[in-house]
Regions:
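Generic structural marker for isolated residues within well-ordered, non-membrane alpha-helices
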Residues: 93, 278, 324
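Phosphate/pyrophosphate- and phosphate-bearing ligand-binding catalytic cores of soluble enzymes
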Residues: 4-5, 10-17, 146-314, 330-342
Length: 342
């Protein structure tokens, strides 16, 4: 177990914000997670549990304990894969395809760790990880006991789970079990995925093979290519991917807006609700490529806020609030950060 005082968190947030914590604890096994839980109980210090830092905006030093999982390992049994909470999510996607297990292709290149996937219910291109998760293994901080949590008890919804609400800071996740399909069924109906799916330098979708392999590999490569074109590399330009959640509005609200903005993109949620891309609204407000101080909006994807170099967390918050205000004024819709602001 790593136990470090006065620790820099710059390498633990993809915005690249310089901030420190009073103490940093990193566990690499269930037993070490139980030891961390004991320390948290006995010290009574405030604590923050982080993953890969790809969904985190630090606005200040954290005067408490930051906890991080470094549990690695992937174990496959039939169509299930159990992964250590410290594994990189995209490596899980790659490993699943190598094992002939399908379902996560659309979630390729989403940054972050396995543990965070279960907390955030990550999703992209019409697929959410909740559809793959079967159980979460964790240590309960209050008791130090191991728990196996059924995914059906997590109340998963769009970018939501009980881990973000009433279970917040209650568990240290040690591993997640996913259940995949042994038959490849592509999900191509969200956004511009179908039209962008080009097999290498070959033809468009009309010749797309639905066989079990290598089509899944091509789909993963297409998703990676699209994300690579639209999203900045955090190693070059600090960012947390999609900063805002796409709002879900009542159908009446959508229809009223569509009368004014007939080209407004939307996605059906259910009979009474529609999802509207926040990035489109931000773009319509003229924010794409604009900046405030050292914080900016990416010039290819308005949903992404970037650290232009030396930005503080507070500068990014100021930009966030300015965008929220403009979207509310223009569309009458509140948009909320997907990023966890500390």
């Amino acid at each position: 177990m790593r136990d470090i005082k006065d620790y820099s968190l710059k390498a633990h947030n993809t915005f690249g914000i310089e901030a420190k914590c009073a103490r940093f604890l990193e566990y690499s096994s269930v037993e070490e997670a139980q030891e961390v839980a004991r320390i948290l109980r006995e010290t009574g210090s405030p604590y923050l549990i982080i993953g890969g830092g790809s969904n985190l905006l630090l606005t200040r030093d954290f005067e408490g304990i930051v906890v991080h999982s470094a549990i690695l390992g992937m174990w496959i049994e039939d169509d299930r894969m159990t992964c250590g909470s410290g594994e990189v999510w995209d490596e899980v996607v790659e490993a699943s395809l190598m094992a002939g297990l399908y379902g996560a292709e659309n979630l390729s290149m989403i940054p972050g760790d396995v543990g965070a996937s279960a907390v955030q219910n990550i999703g992209a291109y019409g697929v959410e990880v909740k559809d793959l998760i079967r159980e979460i293994h964790a240590v309960e901080i209050a008791t130090g006991q191991e728990r196996v949590i059924d995914a059906r008890d997590c109340q998963y919804a769009y970018r939501q789970s009980r881990f973000k609400n009433e279970w917040k800071d209650r568990f240290l996740i040690t591993s997640v079990t996913y259940q995949f399909s042994k038959t490849f069924v592509p999900h191509l109906d969200y956004g511009n995925l179908r039209e962008n799916l080009v097999l290498g330098s070959g033809p468009k979708m009309k010749n797309f093979s639905l066989g079990p392999d290598p089509s899944a590999k091509f789909l993963r490569e297409a998703v990676m290519r699209i994300r690579g074109e639209k999203l900045p590399d955090p190693k070059v330009e600090g960012n947390a991917g999609s900063f805002f959640m796409n709002p879900i509005v009542e159908r009446e609200k959508y229809e009223a807006l569509a009368a004014t903005y007939p080209t407004m993109p939307h996605y059906e949620v259910d009979e009474g609700h529609v999802k509207i891309p926040a990035g489109w609204m931000i773009d319509q407000c003229g924010w794409k490529g604009k900046s405030l101080g050292h914080a900016g909006v990416h010039d290819k994807q308005a949903l992404v806020l970037v650290n232009l170099g030396g930005a503080s967390g507070q500068e990014i918050v100021v930009l966030c609030r300015a965008i929220q205000k403009n979207v509310k004024e223009k569309f009458g819709i509140d948009i909320y950060p997907e990023v966890n602001i500390i």
